[in-house]
Structure formats: structure tokens, C-alpha cells
């Protein structure tokens, strides 16, 4: 790994922690009901929302009531986003006259944005009206992130409270997270992105004259619009030229800010953050990396403060950071090493002052290997899924890294809320394993971990591997699944495995060589996203309710310290072991085989 790459990684981590520490302190006070900062002038608005909805702020819920409210809220969100897409042709703010989205794509997209996945089987600039983007997708970017944060806050209350039947009020948690944390941060980042060059308007698309004439070929058509075929049965191509280009417009910066802060990832444009209107400069690119990790990192500090031991938050953050930094190193080395076959084609892959070198296929020249590799690791460590390069064009090991980061359960920082509650589940598993090894009843943060908690933990951990492996097996077994594969053999399998890994773990990135906008993939990935989200959340809330009802145990000489290097090592080992056991056979059929084939073809 080169010196510039190490310096950028170091700078990224320093800036991240410097911003996350005060944000964590602020979020702690906000979620505990203190009126500070924006809460002072937003408090009347908050109370107005409660009166309008008939919510009593002081009334808390048990875990079942919390879960029911959460699921109802999200199901209504799915219905609203689905309706917007189906009716957008008749609604305003549609200067390009976008037609209604197909039923299967609308179903997929509605679930995708409500579950914080933002998997996209469509191109935003050719499919969605401005109203759908703003009122449907951007709104869900806020509330889906707030939902994840609410769940982890409820789980933390389970650890912090004792002899209590309540874990909080879902409506209050979502409202406060949105009003006081997500909205102010989104305004700041949107203004910065606009200053950097991201667009923000409601104008119709602009036709402009290009600097030079573009020459291209397209299939010749007869009078009825059917392709003309040659004697060999292939379409007859005809030469075309163009001196104009259509530039898409839209309210991009406002959506881009919450897309990153909420670890959502769905792009306004099909190229996502590789598009210069979304991610215009290297500085904007760096700030997008920071935005993705900012709230997940701050939640670690919030965790330490709420349970009364800040060292606990540092331990969780340390485990996440070690795994993330390792992933960045492996990703950067794999992409900088390049592809051996390129050398025989006369392609220079050596780094120099004029080029990044390495595997530049599918990457933006303005970002190069270092910026791209960091972004790849960030977006798949978090459940973001935004991309500034095409992951399908990564080297086999370069593609394995983001896939494996997702397969760990999106716990390496992870999504807003979902990353921390996933890591806390692994922490419970780690102390259970440690307890078995020394013959003691396991406990974590003063709470005894018993049969009920372990049953719920097992369900939580097994949900996503079951979905990923079962749906991948179905897809490679059916003609409808195999029809979407654009690449043969190992890489084609990797495309399907990546798709369901991304969907079930609520990431949203893709190996774009898979043609996924079909009824089969829209329905299958939609189900993976829905069950991958809510079949994890409900058991986690059950754990929160069970822990809150327990009495706090006194620390003794036999209590396992959960704030030191030993526990950090145990936690990392548990996460990696579970990931390896679940997915290594599938990875061996995809990226591992592909890497060996690449080396053999030198």
C-alpha cells in the first residue's frame, strides 16, 4: 500500500473520530430528551407533530408495542412510495413527462428505500420524476435511517435500564432523530455539496452542443421499427453522428446529503456517485466518505455514554476500525496490482505522476485507485451502497472485499443504527462463547445472557445467510435467474451472489453486469430486503425488552471485561468466524475461482 494511500486512510480516520466524538455527545443528550442546540427551536415543531398525531410523548412502549409501531410505519411507507411511482405520470414536478413505473419495479423500489437498502434496478434520470425523487425516495432516506437509529437506541436502553418493562417510544425516537440529527446535518452537507458543484434545481433537462462530433453505431430499423438483420442473422449496424447531448437536471444536492448521512446509497442518477453532478470533486468525494461513517461512529460514543461506561463504546469502535482498515489495505493492494492480462495488451498499469496505474477499468480518472478503493470499503462496510466506480469491474479480490464486508452482516460501522445493533448482537455471542469456555454464566454490561437472548441472537445472525444462500441457489437453478447473467462462469455466479448479499444485508450496491430489472429479480430481491431488515429488527427488540426487565449484576472478579484489547480481539474473531463459516463455500465458487483463473491466464 503506497504512502499516499496510507496518509489518506489515516486522515480519514482522524477527521471521522474528531467529528463523531462531539456528535455522539450531542446525540446522547437529544435521545435522552434534553433540549439543546437545534432542539431549542425545533421543540415547538416536535410538540406540534405529537399533537397532530395524537401521541403522548411521555408514554413509553414495551418491545412488542415498539415493534408493531415500527412495522406499521414502514409498511405505510412502502405503500406511499409504491403509489407515487405508479401515479407519477399524473402528478406535478415531472418536466420530462416520466411515465408510471412498472408494478414489479415499483414494488422493489418501495421496499428498497423503506428498508434503507436503496437497491436500484432502474436509472434515476430516465425513470423517476422530481416529485417521486423528493417526496418518495428522499423522505424515506430520512425516516429509514431514523428507524434504524431508533432500534439501536431501544437496544441500548435495554442494557442501561433494569427491572423495566419499557424500552422507549418509537414515534418520539424517530421524530427526534430526524428533526435534531439528520435534518440539520443534511442541510449542512447539501450546502457544501452545492458549493462543490452538485446541482440543485427543478429545471427541465438541458440540450447542449458538444465540443466535438460524437460518432457511434446503432442497429438499423425498418419502417415498423424492427431491427434489420443481415445474412448472418445479426442486426445491421449503421453509422450515426451527434453534436448534442442531453444533461439531466434535478434537486440532487439535497438528496445526496441524506443519501450519504443516512447510509442509504440510492443515486439520483444511474451512475450514482461516479456522476459529476452528484460527486463533483475529490473533496466532495472525501466528504461523502466521512458522511457515510459519521453517524455510525457517533453511535458508538452514544452507546458508551448511555450505558455509563465510555470505554464500551471505544471497544466497539476499535473492533470496527481494525476490520475496516484491513479491508481498505486489501482492496487498495488488489486494485493497484492490476490485471495481469492487461500487460499483454500493451496497457501500462504502473503508477506515475500522470496516472494512478493499476486496474482503472470502471473507475473515474479524477478519483483514481486510492480514492476509489477507500470509497468501495466505506460504502460496503456501512450499509450504504453508493458507488463512485463500477464494482463489477473490480479485480476478483477487489470484488471479494466488498462482498465479504456485507456478508459479515454490515457490522463494520454498518448502517445508521443497524451497524451498531448488529455488532452488539455479535458482542452477546462473543460473551456467550467466552462464558462457555470458562464455565460461567455469560453476562454483558451487567445483564445475564440466558436462553431467551441466545435464541433471539441465533435468529438474528442466521436470517441474512439463509436468505442470501437460499435465494442465490434458486436464482442459479431457474431460467429466469440465469437469464440476467451477462458474464459466464465464476463471475456470473459472483454477480448473483453479490446481488442477494447486497439485498438481504440492506446495502444496495451491485455488480451491474447482472440485468436485475426483471420481474424475477425485482420480486426476489424485494423479499430479501424486506425479510433481511425486519426479521432482524423484531428479535433485536425482543432482546431489548428482555434485557430491560433484568436486574443489573454487580461486577466481580470473574466478570469478563468487555472494554479491553482481549474483548476486542474476541469480538473480531467472532464476527470473522461466523462470516467465514457461512459464506466461504459460496465465495470459493465465485471470486476465489475467478482470481485463480486470472492468475492462470498470465
UniProtKB/Swiss-Prot annotation:
Protein name: Potassium-transporting ATPase potassium-binding subunit
Localization, UniProt: Cell inner membrane
Chain residue ranges for the region called Disordered: 221-248
Keywords, comma-separated and alphabetical: Cell inner membrane, Cell membrane, Ion transport, Membrane, Potassium, Potassium transport, Transmembrane, Transmembrane helix, Transport
Topology with respect to the bilayer: Multi-pass membrane protein
Family: Belongs to the KdpA family.
Transmembrane segments: 5-25, 65-85, 136-156, 179-199, 283-303, 312-332, 419-439, 458-478, 523-543, 566-586
One example GO MF annotation: potassium ion binding
Subunit text: The system is composed of three essential subunits: KdpA, KdpB and KdpC.
Described function: Part of the high-affinity ATP-driven potassium transport (or Kdp) system, which catalyzes the hydrolysis of ATP coupled with the electrogenic transport of potassium into the cytoplasm. This subunit binds the periplasmic potassium ions and delivers the ions to the membrane domain of KdpB through an intramembrane tunnel.
Listed Basic and acidic residues bias regions: 231-241
Amino acid at each position: 500500500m503506497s504512502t499516499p494511500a496510507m496518509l489518506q486512510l489515516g486522515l480519514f480516520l482522524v477527521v471521522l473520530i474528531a467529528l463523531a466524538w462531539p456528535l455522539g455527545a450531542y446525540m446522547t443528550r437529544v435521545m435522552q430528551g434534553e433540549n439543546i442546540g437545534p432542539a431549542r427551536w425545533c421543540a415547538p415543531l416536535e410538540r406540534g407533530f405529537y399533537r397532530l398525531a395524537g401521541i403522548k410523548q411521555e408514554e413509553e412502549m414495551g418491545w412488542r408495542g415498539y415493534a408493531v409501531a415500527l412495522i406499521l410505519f414502514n409498511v405505510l411507507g412502502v405503500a406511499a412510495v409504491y403509489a407515487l411511482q405508479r401515479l407519477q405520470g399524473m402528478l406535478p414536478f415531472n418536466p420530462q413527462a416520466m411515465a408510471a413505473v412498472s408494478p414489479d419495479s415499483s414494488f422493489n423500489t418501495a421496499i428498497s428505500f423503506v428498508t434503507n437498502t436503496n437497491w436500484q434496478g432502474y436509472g434515476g434520470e430516465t425513470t423517476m420524476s422530481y416529485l417521486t425523487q423528493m417526496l418518495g425516495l428522499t423522505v424515506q432516506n430520512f425516516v429509514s435511517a431514523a428507524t434504524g437509529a431508533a432500534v439501536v437506541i431501544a437496544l441500548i436502553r435495554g442494557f442501561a435500564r433494569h427491572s423495566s418493562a419499557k424500552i422507549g417510544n418509537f414515534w418520539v425516537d424517530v421524530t427526534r432523530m430526524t428533526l435534531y440529527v439528520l435534518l440539520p446535518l443534511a442541510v449542512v452537507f447539501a450546502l457544501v455539496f452545492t458549493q462543490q458543484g452538485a446541482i440543485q434545481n427543478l429545471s427541465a433537462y438541458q440540450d447542449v452542443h458538444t465540443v466535438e462530433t460524437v460518432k457511434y453505431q446503432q442497429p438499423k430499423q425498418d419502417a415498423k421499427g424492427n431491427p434489420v438483420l443481415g445474412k448472418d442473422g445479426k442486426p445491421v449496424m449503421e453509422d450515426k453522428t451527434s453534436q448534442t447531448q442531453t444533461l439531466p437536471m434535478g434537486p440532487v444536492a439535497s438528496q445526496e446529503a441524506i443519501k450519504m448521512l443516512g447510509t442509504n446509497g440510492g443515486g439520483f442518477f444511474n451512475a450514482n456517485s461516479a456522476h459529476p453532478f452528484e460527486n463533483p470533486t475529490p473533496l466532495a468525494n472525501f466528504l461523502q466518505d466521512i458522511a457515510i461513517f459519521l453517524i455510525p461512529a457517533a453511535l458508538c460514543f452514544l452507546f458508551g455514554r448511555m450505558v455509563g461506561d465510555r470505554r464500551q463504546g471505544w471497544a466497539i469502535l476499535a473492533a470496527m476500525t481494525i476490520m475496516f482498515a484491513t479491508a481498505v489495505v486489501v482492496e487498495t493492494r488488489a486494485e493497484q496490482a492490476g490485471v495481469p492480462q492487461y500487460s499483454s495488451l500493451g496497457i501500462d498499469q504502473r503508477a506515475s505522476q500522470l496516472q494512478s496505474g493499476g486496474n482503472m477499468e470502471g473507475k473515474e480518472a479524477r478519483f483514481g485507485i486510492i480514492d476509489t478503493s477507500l470509497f468501495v470499503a466505506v460504502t460496503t462496510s456501512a450499509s450504504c451502497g453508493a458507488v463512485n466506480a463500477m464494482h463489477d469491474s473490480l479485480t476478483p479480490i477487489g470484488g471479494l472485499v466488498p462482498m465479504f464486508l456485507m456478508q459479515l452482516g454490515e457490522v463494520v460501522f454498518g448502517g445508521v443504527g443497524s451497524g451498531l445493533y448488529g455488532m452488539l448482537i455479535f458482542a452477546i455471542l462473543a460473551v456467550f462463547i467466552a462464558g462457555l469456555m470458562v464455565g460461567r454464566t455469560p453476562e454483558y454490561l451487567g445483564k445475564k445472557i440466558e436462553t431467551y437472548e441466545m435464541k433471539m441472537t441465533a435468529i438474528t445472525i442466521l436470517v441474512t445467510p439463509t436468505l442470501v444462500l437460499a435465494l442465490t441457489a434458486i436464482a442459479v437453478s431457474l431460467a429466469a435467474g440465469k437469464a440476467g447473467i451477462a458474464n459466464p462462469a465464476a463471475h456470473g455466479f459472483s454477480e448473483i451472489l453479490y446481488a442477494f448479499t447486497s439485498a438481504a444485508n440492506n446495502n444496495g450496491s451491485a455488480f451491474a453486469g447482472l440485468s436485475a430489472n426483471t420481474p424475477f429479480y425485482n420480486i426476489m430481491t424485494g423479499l430479501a430486503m424486506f425479510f433481511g431488515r425486519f426479521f432482524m429488527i423484531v428479535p433485536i427488540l425482543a432482546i431489548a425488552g428482555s434485557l430491560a426487565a433484568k436486574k443489573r449484576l454487580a461486577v466481580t472478579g470473574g466478570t469478563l471485561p468487555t472494554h479491553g484489547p482481549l474483548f476486542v480481539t474476541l469480538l473480531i474473531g467472532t464476527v470473522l468466524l461466523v462470516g467465514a463459516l457461512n459464506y466461504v463455500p459460496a465465495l470459493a465458487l465465485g471470486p476465489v475461482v475467478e482470481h485463480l483463473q486470472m492468475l492462470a491466464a498470465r
